[in-house]
Curated annotation (Swiss-Prot):
Annotated protein name in UniProt: N-acyl-aromatic-L-amino acid amidohydrolase (carboxylate-forming)
NCBIfam families, alphabetized: PRK02259.1
Function: Plays an important role in deacetylating mercapturic acids in kidney proximal tubules.
Family matches, as InterPro entries: AspA/AstE_fam (IPR050178), Aspartoacylase (IPR016708), AstE_AspA_cat (IPR055438), Aste_AspA_hybrid_dom (IPR007036)
Organism (species): Xenopus tropicalis (Western clawed frog)
Top class in the EC scheme: hydrolase
UniProt keyword list: Cell membrane, Cytoplasm, Hydrolase, Membrane, Metal-binding, Zinc
The family this protein is said to belong to: Belongs to the AspA/AstE family. Aspartoacylase subfamily.
Amino acid sequence: MSPTVQCGAVSQVVVVGGTHGNEMSGVCLAKHWLQDPSELHRKSFTAEVLLANPIAVERCVRYIDRDLNRSFSHELLSASGSESDSYEAKRAREIYQKYGPKQSSLNFVIDLHNTTSNMGTTFLLFKGDNFALHLANYLQTKCVDPSFPCHILLIDIPEGGHVHLQSMGKHSVSLELGPQPQGVARADVLTRMRALVNCSLDFLDLFNQGTEFPSFETDVHQVLYRADFPRNEDGEIEAVIHSELQDKDYLPLKPGDPIFQRLNGEDILYNGEKQIYPVFINEAAYYEKKVAFIATEKTHCLVPALKVQN
């Protein structure tokens, strides 16, 4: 029998929208909750709301100078700063000054994102965060919507440490919902995200009030590598995502399956040695990062029971 994980009660929760200024579900919800946060009140806490990148939101772009969600490295946050720094570096330091240092008083971060890929409901969690895994399991069982199936995608901690906004919290989840075009708010996606946030707050409140959550088993996806598009000698893309791969996020891709198609009609096949599970397939925001899809492996894990520490 696995040991029970004990964690301190959750006192400070922040719901973040607009980390990317053109991911509209979180933008719309954050703006609404900043005007009327009553929906975020629970018996044991009231969640705060943060509009993370307001200038990017105003311009309806992902970011101004650099990706805010890659701007929370120790190096950037600890730098003295200057007028020539990027807007996002300055904004990351502002957020850090308000909620930092990392993983201290801020107990839980819920960061709201959209993707143009067919990712359904994806819970992005840091590897080893059993508390967040319990939250994801609660959402999978209590907040079901067949139109947006749930998946858990674990984030590796880079060698230099966390760079994501959600790393400000001791525990965290990024809700990644799609497909949804950039700069567009879809009612079905927004409604789904709103329900997930409310259900997340219910879980945190139940935990604070002493509810014990039993151990469970679940499937998780872990990143193997990032695959670029085929490119010519000038660095230009010379093939697109194959129609048989498009929208097949989280489905198995076997050696010999088509992944790209050249403009002359030639298929490019997956030549790996083992089955993988592609995610973020043809994500619009990843073209600049030279990522056509992210290859993952699916593993099964046992998560120990959870209860509040007295």
